[in-house]
From Swiss-Prot:
Function statement: Ring cleavage of cyclic ester dienelactone to produce maleylacetate.
Organism per entry: Cupriavidus pinatubonensis (strain JMP 134 / LMG 1197)
Entry keywords, A to Z: Aromatic hydrocarbons catabolism, Hydrolase, Plasmid, Serine esterase
Protein's recorded name: Carboxymethylenebutenolidase 2
Catalytic activity: 2-(5-oxo-2,5-dihydrofuran-2-ylidene)acetate + H2O = 4-oxohex-2-enedioate + H(+)
UniProt lineage: Bacteria, Pseudomonadati, Pseudomonadota, Betaproteobacteria, Burkholderiales
Amino acid sequence: MCHDTAPALFPRTASTGSIDGAICALCYAGATRGPRLLVLPDIYGCNAFYRGYAAYLAEQGAGEVLLVDPFAAFGELATVTREAAFQRRHRLADRAYVEELIDFIDGQRIEGVVGFCLGGLFVFELARQQVVSRLVAYYPFPQGLENRDPLDVPFDYLPALRSRHTVIVGDDDALLGTQNLQRLQAQARANDAIDLHIMNGAGHGFLADLESPDTARAAVAKRGLRIGTTTLLGG
C-alpha cells in the first residue's frame, strides 16, 4: 500500500460536499481564492491519507480540492488487501476513464492535478493532452501499466512532450526499478518539460514517512510534499 493513515500534519477536516456522475469526487473547500485542484489516488482509493491530503491542500491555499474516486462504480474494498485492490483496479478501463476525467476537469475548471502511483500514470496522459498547466505525479509508472483499455506508454511520448509536469520519485522505488529510473532521468535531461525530482533513499510511497522516527526519511518525505505543494499552489 502506498499510504493508508493520515499523518498528524494533515487536518482532520471532513469533506464539504460530493460530486456523483461519470466522475465521482469528494469536495474540500478552501478559505482562499486559490486554484481549484484535483487529486488522483492510488489503487486503494480515497482512504484516510488522501482525504487528509486533500484537506491539507485546501488549508495550504487551494480554493477547492476535489478528491476523485476512480473506483466508485465498483464499491468499497471488502478487505483492504493488495490482492483485493488489484482485482478492483483491473475493472477500471484506463483510457476511457481518463477521457471522462478530461471532460470533468474542463467542466470543473480545474487548474492543477496531482496523482499518486496509478494516478501518476494518469497525470502523464494529462500532460500529453495538455489538459492543465499545473501537474504533479508522485511515484508514477513511465513504463506504463497493463490494463484492458491501456493508456499509451509514457516513455514512448515523453521525449516530445511540451507540457511541463513535475515528477517526484524515490531512487529506491522497487516498483519503478533501476532501469526505468535511469531511462526517466535520461529523458528528463533531454526535455526540460519533465521537472524530475529524485528523493535519495526513498522508496515507493515515501510520503508515508512524513512521521517516520527516522529523521532522514521524514525529512525526505517533507521535502517531497513541499515540492508538490509549491508546484500546485504556486510560489
